[in-house]
Amino acid sequence: MRLEKAATLLHSNAEMTITEIGLRCGFASSASFANSFKRYFGKSASLYRSIKESVSTKKYICLPDENRDALDIRIEQQENILSYHIRGEGYQRKVDIVQLPPWHIAYIRYTGPYKGDTALFSRLWNKLNFWAAPLGLFNNPDSVFLTLCHDDPEITMEEKLRVSVCISIDEDLQPTGDVGKMQLPGGKYAVCRFHLGPQDYPSAWGWMYGTWLPLSSYQADDRVSFEQFLPHEQQDDGEKITVAICIPVKAANFAIIS
């Protein structure tokens, strides 16, 4: 997992040197990081970074709604929330920069391929509900429902992808059985609501990281990203659900949009 985290940082944190990334991910020296990275990915860290930048640039240039000139972008500050209002071809979206609190969460984790697998997620949520419902957690209006994406599908092999379905709990509550517990750190997040069908999630995540983030004055942080299920915003239209995609961010060294 250290190497996969390093690969993500190479792509998302251009201001960090390769040596800094290796040390951040727990390698004792730049040489040990370089050797391990090349064995795992089949190319050097510097080449990997340059290839990823080239691919991202090609996607940015070739897709019409990812062309900066084709987007209408308005930035608004209200109290403690900075909002990006973005109008593209056939859509309007709002990305809020918010400070989220830390949460103690109970979770069920799955390792393996999960893209578009609604049956899998139903089983995971039912398993979590079996433990949480008798405690009144699913009917608690203060409960927060999250899906945590631990790995980048573009980097991690499908059979090693990890995903967790989660519910917020009190700090002193101890889960049992297959239900785990962890603390999700708070901090600054970019939050955007989407109404998605089972096959729509990759494009929504891609829009956040590939369209909005490069145009913002932020860069990705290395905390975990997640989807928040919004019970009171659901619409009765089949399999589509409303979620807020939340990605951890920090201020970039320079602003791309003035």
Label each PLM-derived region with a short phrase:
Residues 4, 8, 16-19, 28-258:
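A solvent-exposed interaction/effector surface
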Residues 21-23:
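Short alpha-helical "recognition helix" segments of helix-turn-helix
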